[in-house]
Every structure is written in structure tokens, then in C-alpha cells.
A protein has these predicted regions:
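Juxtamembrane cytosolic amphipathic helices that cap and anchor the N-termini
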Residues: 1-15
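Short amphipathic helix-loop junctions that connect adjacent transmembrane helices
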Residues: 24-39
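Loop-to-transmembrane helix entry/capping segments in MFS-fold secondary transporters
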Residues: 37-38, 122-132
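Helix-to-loop junctions at the C-terminal end of transmembrane segments
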Residues: 54-67, 151
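Structural signature of the two symmetry-related core transmembrane helices
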Residues: 69-84
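Helix-loop junctions at membrane interfaces in 12-TM secondary transporters
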Residues: 86-97
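Intracellular juxtamembrane helix-capping segments at the cytosolic ends
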Residues: 107-121
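A membrane-interface helix-boundary motif in multi-pass transporters
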Residues: 149-167
Length: 177
């Protein structure tokens, strides 16, 4: 039954929080803290390139049924990306982290989608699909809200460390699958 997917939903909410913070505040951070006026679009181009590339090389593990392994590998790569972003506030880390986060999320999300669907009965697959999307959306909304509060009162660094910690927590929780 889908009640077994509760831990996975919690993980997806953690990962969605990261995406909510990064996706909404990275351009402001780049402009205000790093002085990148016209280059924040490159961040998103590298992020989407990472997503695309990881979908190409991560599909083999999915076909072999290595869902948790694929999710863990992607989560670790994303954790490195978010941590690099928080740890090294510079232009090179800004762009390198985008590629790493894209590579990780592109590998992690399809694995989670397959795990959600695999715990559902045949007649619950639509519910499983909507459950992962709802979990992601709730996480993103919380990330946008919490990231805004942290950025305003404690600065961007606190928001991005919160993101790295959320990603690391979700990564460790995968070990429970």
C-alpha cells in the first residue's frame, strides 16, 4: 500500500525544499553577492544540462531495478553540489554546483518515481504519481518560504547551508530503504 511510501514522501519533501531555495534565490544571490549581472542564466543552463546528462547514464540502473542505489548515488552527487555552493562562495563554485545538482537530481528523481510506483498496487499508480508530485510541491513551497526567511534575517549563506543540510538529511534517510 502507499502508506509504505511515507518515508519516501518525507525524502522528496526534503529534496524539494532544496530545489525551492536554490531555484528562487540563486539569481538574487549571484547578482547581489557575486556581482554576476548577466550570467545567472548560465547557472540554469548547466543545471538543466546536468539533468539531461544524468538521465542518459542513470537509466541503466533503473532498468536493472537498482532503484535505491540510483536514488542514493543521485542524492550524494546533489549533496556535494549543494555543499560546494554553500561552502565556496565564488563564481567557479556557483557554476560547478549547478552541474552537480543537475546531475544528482536527474538521477535521483526518476529512481524515486519508480520506487513510489513500485510500492503501489496496479490500481494505485496514479495515486503514487500524484503523491510524489505533491510531496515535491510541498517541499518546494516550504523551501521558498524558509529560504526567504533565512535569507532576509540571516543572509544567503544560512539559506544555502540549510539547503545543504536538508539534502544531506534526505540522503542519509535513503539508507533506510
Amino acid at each position: 500500500s502507499l502508506t509504505r511510501a511515507g518515508l519516501m514522501a518525507g525524502n522528496i519533501m526534503l529534496f524539494g525544499r532544496c530545489w525551492g531555495v536554490m531555484g528562487n534565490y540563486v539569481a538574487l544571490y549571484g547578482k547581489q553577492q557575486l556581482g554576476i549581472v548577466d550570467g545567472t542564466g548560465i547557472f540554469f543552463a548547466l543545471l538543466s544540462s546536468g539533468l539531461f546528462i544524468s538521465r542518459l547514464y542513470g537509466v541503466k540502473g533503473l532498468r536493472e531495478g537498482k532503484l535505491a542505489e540510483n536514488a542514493l548515488e543521485g542524492a550524494v552527487i546533489s549533496t556535494v553540489g549543494y555543499t560546494l555552493f554553500a561552502l565556496a562562495p565564488g563564481i567557479w563554485a556557483f557554476y560547478a554546483s549547478a552541474l552537480l545538482i543537475g546531475l544528482g537530481n536527474g538521477r535521483m528523481y526518476p529512481a524515486f518515481l519508480n520506487m513510489f510506483i513500485s510500492v503501489a498496487r496496479h490500481d494505485q499508480r496514479g495515486t503514487a504519481n500524484s503523491s510524489i508530485l505533491t510531496s515535491w510541491d510541498v517541499g518546494m513551497g516550504l523551501g521558498i518560504l524558509l529560504g526567504g526567511v533565512l535569507s532576509q534575517y540571516l543572509g544567503y549563506s544560512a539559506a544555502f547551508w540549510f539547503t545543504a543540510a536538508s539534502q544531506a538529511t534526505g540522503t542519509l534517510l535513503i539508507l533506510l530503504f
